[in-house]
Amino acid sequence: MNSTPRSFFYFLFTGSYAIFLLTFLLLPSDSLPEHKILSADKLWHMLSYFLLALGLMFSFREGGWKRWYNRRWSLIISLGHAGFSEVLQEFVPGRSASIDDWIANCIGIGLALLGLNLFPKFFEKSSSP
């Protein structure tokens, strides 16, 4: 691992995004969105967790981590965040835990990881300065 100021910035930015996302998902709500398969709510869940996983992958890349390590920890952290946020929503007024939301989160994470596999050179740090 090669820790650089740029790597620190990426992790700081991604960590801040994760905290913002958790805070936003735990705000009390007056009404619950409808549970449709392709509703705007599900698309927002997918996009939010796609961005979280993507941020983690770039953070690990800037730290000089290998692709297998990048993939593994991006998946573990993203899935942990998604599951934790859904469980906590059960205790927030106007919110509820939803397996549909968690599946949408997982799809977003999966799409980011698919991008890592389809475009590996994009996610690997070049050896030139």
Question: What does each of the following model-derived ranges do?
Answer:
Residues 1-102, 106-129:
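Bulky hydrophobic segments
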